[in-house]
Amino acid sequence: KLNNEHCTVIMGAASVVSRTDENVVIACGDVQYEAENLLICTGSNNFVPPIPGVKDNPAIWDSTMALDSKELPQSMIIVGGGVIGMEFATLYHELGVPVTVIEAMPTILPNLDQEVVTILLEKYRKAGMQILTDTKVTEVQGNKVLTTNGEYEAEHILVSVGRRANMQGLEALSDLEMYRGGIVVDEMMRTNLKNVYAAGDVT
């Protein structure tokens, strides 16, 4: 439906070739396209922390793998006590899965009002959820998680430490202002580059 006189859809992997204040050049395959403005909507990817034993470990899940699973794990360790991590922790706990949350910060949900967090933390722990704060993961050995406060084991380990903007193909825009893994925009979705805009999970 997008293919009409106002919009042309081109399937393929695109990359930015060059940018000036007057135009942006994009390459898709062997063809280049030029426009006055660029809107970046490349989304984001799960961030995989450089923790020894995480990469290529079949026990490790990200949020996409957790949602795609057809079976409940026997037990779950969730690395990261942010919003997404605690959403999964609550979900699995309600489904009867023993859950341990490991958060490196002094508290879970660090971006929320701390009075609310205190109430939630008490509720989670009273319900039987194990929540470890101020605890850093140092290594993963199969199903075992080694931390600064001991070792923990579960059938699966869900790594939920945030997402990062998908910047593949945007290397030519090295001057883009970034913050916490996303492109910085104003209320009009403008970046710090005159003719470059961004929207969605990439911000």
Per-region residue spans from a language model:
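Flavin (primarily FAD) cofactor-binding/catalytic cores of flavoenzymes
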Residues: 14, 134-138, 170, 191
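Short hydrophobic core segments
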Residues: 14, 32-43, 78-79, 99, ...
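Conserved beta-strand-loop-beta-strand element in the redox core of flavoprotein oxidoreductases
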Residues: 18-32, 141-151, 157
